[in-house]
From Swiss-Prot:
Protein name: DNA mismatch repair protein MutS
Organism domain of life: Bacteria
Underlying gene: mutS
Parts of the chain that traverse the membrane: none
Coiled-coil spans in chain: none
Keyword vocabulary terms for this entry: ATP-binding, DNA damage, DNA repair, DNA-binding, Nucleotide-binding
One GO BP: mismatch repair
Family classification: Belongs to the DNA mismatch repair MutS family.
GO CC term (a single one): cytosol
Length: 882
């Protein structure tokens, strides 16, 4: 940053330097010299430098912080020859609030804190050190995290078409690795995880700071990695296989990574080791305890690509990205933050293993049938705090006394939880029937040591109960005795001096004092020593008062230090139990999710789907889980669906009017399949669900302005992805393929796509369309059936019945939809006239039927039909008749 880039208002401060690198160090004050030395080591982070009650920023960082946080940008003297330099500051007690804003904007922050008091300082400066670096993916502070979603840090290693991925949430201890082939799979995993920060090894000589979302990526980052994430380029050395493996073995005290499942996965090891190195560098002494890395394969879970997650509105709505109206919104009845995070993960990573699915179903079934157990469980869960993050902060050494009390209260609820679930039969609930006794003992110890309402600050006393430590009680008794002496001093001095207005007071600057009005100053005894003169007041001390003050202050300092030491001991004790606490927390979170899904199932009248090993999808009276909750009770019209059985079709051509509910029906089927594979009950009267390997959706499209792609090109890219990756075990939901181009081109593409899905792939497919000519496919291919969303025609209007029935529609009623939208009557009348002419002259359906009755694989091409009717198109849009 040059001098010319200084904000104009700093000119009045005669500020000349905007960058600390512009200034010769020996011209700076000692404090500023130290600041510059620290900043040299952290050029890529914003440096927050503790000065008393504030964290200050200087030079270029001050300008950035003032701009991003909308703070006052002022200046500070940095040396006689340097003059004033830019400065901005935030109160130390508001660090979390301001730091979270900077992190959300994609900045990394280096915290340079005071590690000794002014009284402890040996030289002219209080010692300051970098205590931790906060980046988007390494946040531990409660106030900077979203309670009900994970904050993942990811690391990626790519070798050709092969890739390794590691991700961790340092606040909860989750640590996972994977390795696979095909960069598309890596892209989709990152979209699923939504990491706050992605690490990528680079040999570039200048490793820039964080690349914020939307910034142009350097050439070192492959195009397959989405622009919507925050990236940190890292030195390749920590990602080298030998170094990464050794770091993992040493950190987790292992002889082999076989137990972690990644011993034979070199790219996964490299990613995991590089991630661990970054956490150690940024968190310093506050490195949160991580679980041993666990390895998973993409083939273990149903694959949902980003397009499908968006179209099915799993965690946010498609229209405005809000939580309200999403599937997660409709299902989330969890009582704990841990449960909320786990439910989100279950929804984004459905299972393929039928046995695992049935285990979840069994627990939900039991909780549905035993309403008393379900309600008691949910009431008890409501009293349990976030065990994962509380124990994580304790392990990292950042937990305060209130954190430990919340942890203690939660641990003491566990025996009650075990007793409640003692009669549970399902394996997932039964795993909470035994709670390690040491956790209850730890909870008791914490409650016995900590006061009921401790302060947030840890160094100002008031943390530990009386009776815990003899030395602590003796110090408190001494301080209390001296304070009582001071409290009685005012009365005794009034009697001794005869001055009834005499008062005893205290200030942080001058300590204890005797206060008199200036009019009484000539009446003070000889042993009073003047300490301060104010406008209307004189302040004095006495030798005895000075001695007592010194005793109180020294004893209070010792008292505060002793309380802090006792607290740190308690916190350290908790850190030794983090692994056990988190194991229990995992089971508690699962019980919470299962109870929440049971609650939804009971109140929304869901059924338990039969999980099948074949391809059958049979839904009787299915409902959309979100839409039905948004409507008054009983208003939602249920619909059935049958796909993939010996008697049923593989592909349904779904026709019907605009706004009749076709898209809702598609999403309904997709969500029921997804819910079944997370082990949930589903909104239907009855359901038989065959395991699905992928769900594909193409519902609506818009221009992609960022890549210069039109609506039609976006649609074709999405369709190509489906045709290239779908299998016979996939579920494909397509809406309006081919509508983004000319009518006959669109019909040609729609016909060919539907035919390919039914004949070649034989994926279970619902193909919603306004091309009624596609109804002819059912006469050509045995595994295609026609269904329509019905309407009731009245003399002056139509009524949407929202019922899906066998048969193909021959009208779309688009003009009726336009009329309902409020188009002028002249436009509606003209549209009807043009429609009449088009219907009279069209030969498309006739041409398509030429193939009917012949071999299944032959039919007239839509291009031939185009040529046949080309001449008939002339004159269709001549002026209206009079």
């Amino acid at each position: 940053m040059t001098t010319s880039e200084l904000p104009e208002h700093l000119a009045k401060h005669e500020v000349r330097y905007a960058d600390h690198r512009q200034v010769e160090r020996d011209r700076l004050t000692p404090m500023m010299q130290h600041y510059a030395e620290v900043k040299d080591q952290h050029l890529q982070q914003i440096l927050l430098y503790r000065m008393g009650d504030f964290f200050e920023c200087f030079f270029q960082d001050a300008i950035v912080v003032a701009r991003e946080l909308e703070l006052v940008l002022t200046s500070k003297e940095a040396g006689k020859e340097v003059g004033r330099v830019p400065m901005a500051g935030i109160p130390y007690h508001a660090l979390d609030r301001y730091a979270s804003q900077l992190v959300e904007k994609g900045y990394a922050i280096a915290i340079c804190d005071q590690v000794e008091t002014a009284a402890q300082a040996q030289g002219p400066l209080v010692r300051r050190e970098i205590t931790r670096i906060i980046t988007p993916g390494t946040i531990l502070e409660e106030g900077m995290l979203q309670a009900r979603r994970n904050n993942f840090l990811a690391a990626v290693v790519i070798a050709g078409e092969h890739w390794g991925l590691a991700y961790a949430d340092s606040s909860t201890g989750d640590y996972w690795t994977s390795q696979s082939t095909g960069l598309e799979g890596l892209t989709q995993e990152l979209y699923r995880l939504q990491p706050s920060e992605v690490l990528f090894p680079s040999a570039a000589p200048d490793l820039a700071g964080l690349l914020r979302p939307g910034q142009s990526k350097p050439q070192q980052i492959p195009d397959c990695l989405p622009d919507s994430f925050c990236y940190a380029l890292r030195s390749p050395m920590p990602f080298e296989l030998h170094e990464a493996r050794q770091r993992l073995l040493e950190h987790f005290q292992l002889r082999s990574l076989e137990g972690c499942g990644c011993e034979q996965l070199p790219l996964a090891i490299r990613a995991a080791g590089g991630l661990l190195d970054y956490l150690g560098e940024t968190q310093r002494e506050s490195l949160a305890p991580l679980q041993k890395p666990r390895t998973y394969s993409l083939s273990e879970f149903l694959i949902l690509d980003q397009q499908t997650r968006r179209n099915l509105e799993i965690t946010q709505t498609q229209r405005d990205g809000s939580f309200h109206g999403s599937l997660l919104w409709a299902l989330d009845r969890t009582m704990t933050s841990m449960g909320g995070r786990l439910l989100r993960r279950w929804l984004l990573q459905p299972l393929l293993n039928p046995e695992a699915i049935r285990n979840r179903q069994a627990a939900i079934q039991e909780l549905c049938q035993d309403g008393r157990l379900r309600q008691d469980l949910r009431s008890l869960l409501q009293k349990i705090y976030d065990l994962e993050r509380l124990s994580g902060r304790a392990g990292a050494g950042t937990a305060n006394a209130r954190d430990l009390l919340a942890l203690a209260e939660s641990l003491l609820r566990l025996p009650e939880l075990a007793q409640l679930l003692s009669r549970a039969q399902s394996p997932l609930l039964a795993q909470l029937q035994q709670v390690p006794p040491e956790l209850e003992q730890l909870g008791d110890r914490l409650q016995q040591h900590l006061v009921e309402s401790p302060p947030l600050q840890l160094t100002e006393g008031g943390l530990i109960r009386s009776g815990v430590a003899i030395a602590l009680d003796e110090l408190r008794q001494q301080v209390e005795s001296d304070r009582q002496w001071i409290a009685s001093l005012e009365a005794s001095e009034r009697t001794a001096t005869g001055i009834n207005s005499l008062k005893v007071g205290y200030s942080k600057t001058f300590g204890y004092f005797i206060s008199l009005s200036r009019s009484k100053a000539d009446q003070v005894p000889d042993h009073y020593i003047r300490r301060q003169t104010l406008t209307n007041e004189e302040r004095f001390i006495t030798p005895d008062l000075k001695e007592r003050e010194s005793r109180i202050l020294n004893a209070q300092t010792d008292l505060n230090q002793l309380e802090y030491d006792l607290f740190v001991g308690l916190r350290s004790e908790v850190s030794h139990h983090v692994e056990t606490i988190r194991a229990i927390a995992t089971a508690v979170a699962a019980a919470d999710v299962l109870a929440a899904l049971a609650e939804v199932a009971v109140y929304q009248n869901y059924c338990c789907p039969e999980i099948r090993d074949d391809r059958q999808l049979a839904i009787q009276d299915g409902r959309h889980p979100v839409v039905e909750q948004a409507l008054p009770s009983g208003f939602y019209v249920p619909n059935s669906c049958g796909l993939g059985s010996d008697r049923g079709p593989d592909l349904i051509v779904l026709t019907g009017p605009n706004a009749s509910g076709k898209s809702c029906y598609l999403r309904q089927v997709g969500l029921i399949q997804l819910l079944a594979q997370i082990g949930s009950f589903v909104p239907a009267k009855n359901a038989q669900v065959g395991i699905c390997d992928r769900i594909f959706t193409r519902v609506g499209a818009v221009d992609d302005l960022a890549t210069g792609q039109s609506t039609f090109m976006v649609e074709m890219n999405e369709t190509a992805n489906i045709l290239n990756h779908a299998t016979a075990r996939s579920l494909v939901l397509l809406d309006e393929i081919g509508r983004g181009t000319a009518t006959f081109d669109g019909l040609s593409i729609a016909w060919a796509v539907a035919e390919y899905l039914a004949r070649e792939i034989q994926a279970r497919t619902i193909f919603a369309t306004h091309y009624h000519e596609l109804n002819e496919l059912s006469g050509l291919l045995k595994n295609v059936a026609n269904f329509q969303v019905t309407v009731k025609e009245l003399p002056d209007r139509i009524v949407f019945l929202h019922q899906v029935q066998p048969g193909g529609a021959d009208r779309s009623y688009g003009i009726e939809a336009a009329r309902l939208a409020g188009l002028p009557s002249e436009v509606i009348d003209r549209a009807r006239e043009v429609m009449s002419r088009i219907e009279k002259h069209s030969r498309i359906a006739v041409g398509l039927r030429r193939g009917n009755g012949s071999q299944r694989r032959t039919q007239a091409s839509p291009q031939q039909i185009d040529a046949t009717i080309a001449t008939e198109q002339l004159g269709l849009f001549s002026g209206p008749s009079h």
